[in-house]
Structures are given as C-alpha cells and as structure tokens.
C-alpha cells in the first residue's frame, strides 16, 4: 500500500464550511489517478474481499472506477447506484445525507436475495453507505461485504448499522494534515 500511503500524504485538504475535505485521486479523480495506484488498490481489495456474490454495487461517482476494475477481474456483474432517476420498473429511491450535502440516489437491477459486495472510495460521515445499506436491506438483499479504500476515522452513520466495513487504510485529517492510523 506504499503508493496509497504516499498519495494520502500528498493530497490537498480544503475547508468546506468547516469540514476538512480530502482531495485525493481515488476519492475525487484529482489530482490525476495514476494506473499504478489504481492497480495497487484493486489488487488489495481482491485479496481482502469475498467475491462469492451476485453483484458488485458501487455508488456514483467515485466508486465506479474501482468497481469496474473489480468486475473486469472477477466477472461479477456491476450495478451503479445513480444520482439520477431513470424511472425503470423496480427502481428504488434513497435519500442520503453526508457532512457536506444531501441528495437522492437510485437503485436499479437489484432484487431480493441478491448477494452483494459494496465498493466505495471513501467512508467519512457514512451517510452514503448507510443510506445504501438501508435501501439494500429493505429490498431484501444479503450484503456479503462492504469495502472502502479510505476510512476517515470518527463518528459515522455506519456505526448505527449492523454491517461491518473493511477499509484498506484508516486516516484522520486534522489541521490540514493526513495521519495514517
């Protein structure tokens, strides 16, 4: 995880209304995402995750590149939870609230009984993942594994759920500095 650790120490931190926001290639697509970093992250996820699932699920937008690479390597179909409604039969809307925004997301092509692996870039406030897990639980799926690349240590909406989250690296961001735990 040498590349990931290096990139975290080099990542800019910006203030978003009092929230220290990490700007990182994995979680934001800027600065540029080098193939070596993406490869390192995908290999590590593959070594730690359970791929005995029916579908890999990733929220738009920054989970897509990770889930795509994993789908290509494992031949497990990919479902993207979108920020836009398509009005398709069976579409499920969910409301997410994070430390810096609120919005709706939409789930398609997920059915009761599906075994799911959720992949995302960053767990910070947990609002996105908690909303997704709640909706997938309501649908009747079996969430087999939840993997994030970066977990920002602190209170998270995921703490209130019965789902464990695996992270490749845990960090704190304080006074504009990233510390790897």
UniProtKB/Swiss-Prot annotation:
Tell me which CDD domains the record gives: PRTases_typeI
Q: Which GO terms describe its molecular function?
A: transferase activity
Which NCBIfam families does this UniProt record tie to the protein?
HPT_Archaea (NF040646), PRK02304.1-4 (NF002635)
**Entry protein name:** HGPRTase-like protein 2
**General function of this protein:** May catalyze a purine salvage reaction, the substrate is unknown.
For the protein in the UniProt heading, the enzyme class is transferase
Q: What is its EC number?
A: 2.4.2.-
UniProt xrefs under Pfam families: Pribosyltran
Q: Give the similarity note.
A: Belongs to the purine/pyrimidine phosphoribosyltransferase family. Archaeal HPRT subfamily.
Q: List the disulfide bonds.
A: none
Lineage summary? Archaea, Methanobacteriati, Methanobacteriota, Stenosarchaea group, Halobacteria
Keyword annotations from UniProtKB, A to Z? Purine salvage, Transferase
- Kindly indicate whether the keyword Nuclease belongs to this entry: no
Name the GO terms of the biological process aspect: purine ribonucleoside salvage
> Which PROSITE patterns does UniProt cross-reference here?
PUR_PYR_PR_TRANSFER
The protein's matches in InterPro entries, at most eight in alphabetical order, are given as: HGPRTase-like, PRibTrfase_dom, PRTase-like, Pur/Pyrimidine_PRTase
